């Protein structure tokens, strides 16, 4: 019996070891990171403090840039809500998504979203605000799909800050989601702000945002520099700040709960600002977007600025990668994008991965208003600071037709100001840039001409860019390259009130179109 104390000690040590092992097992499972994807609605590149902008205050994004990575060359493949978001959730380019390459589409059931895949592999998924859309998304059985997760929308403010800013308490809804998340289970949340989508309350940037007309250091070269345009820009800025405010509250809540360390947070926008020559076009201010990613546990050497070209099709494979999921097991259609984890693991700034030297862009049918529900097909490539565009249907206008009000560009004080330049000889080039007919080929030097106002295609060779663009599109099965591009005009709009809008309007019908959410 004199060995009894020794035996007791051995048993105690074994019990302690077992307890550590059993405790470590759920820790391994929980080691999968949480994912917070924050996407604004119509926010252009450069409009954040982290990029040096003085007339928009974005402390939350600025913090993410300091504590993570700030990207300078992030692009959506399509500068319109539905197709851009389709690229985000599938990891595929718009020409690989059938009807989902159009705006206001009927989303094909065959394309699974990364949120749906994560949910099937142990993640708790949810969203607030605007998910994929506008459009209709149902499964093969006709049931509505939760493309970006279960909706959390219970919390709203009693009144609006402005007529244009949503009452939705996005951060409050995020708190409800966190409360509902099972302990020990990783989660993925989609924060889809409705801001800075139009319409704005004119003058709210000055009246309620404590801004001054003189705060704006530069009006883009594609618009006239007027008080109305500057006010419009400040109203837009005030809405961007509202989006950032909720993001800041979400970061603070994660910190409070001790979950920020192992949460990958992404902040970006679906497309550029809702102004002429921006949203819905294929120029620099259309597809070039803000992007910062923070992940304390997973990003080496935070505070870096990365100049590699990044496409929105890279988000889905990144999220699957950090979740430890093989794409072949997800049930998703093959992914074209490339995970960003190589950049996360690097300690370099500037250009890191040699192959990330370009992105591909596109446009098909966006908003209503053209005869026969026609779109405006474009394919483009951005490489090493040069943007080359090929416009397939030069007889059509890029923003629609005057008879229905150029509906491919959102109504706004700036749109009104640009339309007015048609009658002003010294400013008519502004009208032509946004609403006039375009040549088949356009080439811009984004380093010298970020607003894409000087077409170099008549004096500088674009043959190499065109060749690379067309070859990659063919490899990816783009119908435009296979003589089947008309299919995009044949896909019906998701909502009946969108169909044959031009013919019905010309025929005298007064149509109250579905409001875009």
What are these regions (language model features)?
Residues 471, 479-491:
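Mature extracytoplasmic/periplasmic domains
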Residues 2-5, 10, 16, 20-442, ...:
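Formylglycine-dependent sulfatase
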